[in-house]
From Swiss-Prot:
Its EC number is 3.4.23.36. PANTHER family: LIPOPROTEIN SIGNAL PEPTIDASE. The lineage of its organism: Bacteria, Pseudomonadati, Pseudomonadota, Gammaproteobacteria, Pseudomonadales. This is Lipoprotein signal peptidase. One of its GO terms (cellular component) is plasma membrane. It is an enzyme of class 3 (hydrolase). This protein specifically catalyzes the removal of signal peptides from prolipoproteins. Keywords: Aspartyl protease, Cell inner membrane, Cell membrane, Hydrolase, Membrane, Protease, Transmembrane, Transmembrane helix. The chain crosses the membrane at residues 11-31, 41-61, 69-89, 95-115, 136-156. GO terms for molecular function: aspartic-type endopeptidase activity. It comes from Pseudomonas fluorescens (strain ATCC BAA-477 / NRRL B-23932 / Pf-5). It comes from the Bacteria. The active site is at D125, D144.
Length: 170
């Protein structure tokens, strides 16, 4: 009879997804209640500010000017991706910790933005990186950061050395 760790793969890493989801939602609640739309609070002059922005589209406001159908399209995509990530986590081996962390980060971020999209009709963004008043990166949130870190980890995982045909993940 297989033990629980073998049967459930790396699903124990779902705690990290839940942590990302909680931090994301608490931070969004804080900034939404503290700032008015597009207000900026400078943290590091010329480089970093807090702000409040709503994004009805995807990354970089892709399709944000749609009539509302994009809300449900992006929600369905997030649900499908989340299901794939859970199955992938379940199938990971004991030695694939790096990959488990990456997947858990992406999953937590996807769920954080999915909640916003379904419950609010938009995603709350509050982190603004800029250079003086000349260049602004699109506003983003904690969930976006977790997705980005997880995606970079997944990309780096593809380049790890291989031993006996298996990727080394720890």
């Amino acid at each position: 009879m297989p033990n629980a760790a073998g049967r459930f793969g790396r699903l124990g890493w779902l705690w990290l997804s839940v942590l990302v989801l909680v931090i994301d939602q608490v931070s969004k609640l804080h900034f939404e209640s503290s700032l008015s739309m597009y207000q900026q609070i400078v943290v590091i002059p010329d480089y970093f500010s807090w702000t409040l922005a709503y994004n009805t589209g995807a990354a970089f406001s892709f399709l944000a000017d749609g009539s509302g159908w994009q809300r449900w399209l992006f929600a369905l995509i997030a649900i499908a991706v989340s299901a794939v990530l859970v199955v992938w986590l379940k199938r990971l081996g004991r030695n694939e910790t790096w990959l488990a962390i990456a997947l858990a980060l992406v999953l937590g971020g996807a769920l954080g933005n999915l909640y916003d999209r379904i419950a609010l009709g938009h995603v709350i963004d509050f982190i603004l990186v800029h250079w003086q008043n000349r260049w602004y990166f699109p506003a983003f949130n904690f969930a976006d950061s977790a997705i980005t870190v997880g995606a970079v980890m997944l990309a780096l995982d593809m380049f790890k050395s291989k031993k006996t045909g298996e990727a080394v993940h720890d």
